[in-house]
Amino acid sequence: SGSKTATKGDGCFGVRIDRIGSTSGMGCGGVPKPTPGGS
């Protein structure tokens, strides 16, 4: 489901973080901490 987000890299690191993003809290799909603007 978050493939499209990981593909664009919308301010995120990539698909590698997409799966551990929930646990790490560094993913945009869950909690956009590193990107508050979403840019």
Swiss-Prot record:
One of its GO terms (biological process) is vasodilation. Residues 1-8 form a propeptide. The keyword Zinc does not apply. Pfam families: ANP. GO terms for cellular component: extracellular region. Keywords: Disulfide bond, Hypotensive agent, Secreted, Toxin, Vasoactive, Vasodilator. One of its GO terms (molecular function) is hormone activity. Expressed by the venom gland. It is found in: Secreted. Its main location: secreted. Transmembrane segments: none annotated. Signal peptide: none annotated. Residues 20-39 are annotated as: Disordered. Belongs to the natriuretic peptide family. Snake venom natriuretic peptide that targets both NPR1 and NPR2. Exhibits hypotensive and vasodepressor activities. This is Natriuretic peptide CnNP-b. It comes from Cryptophis nigrescens.
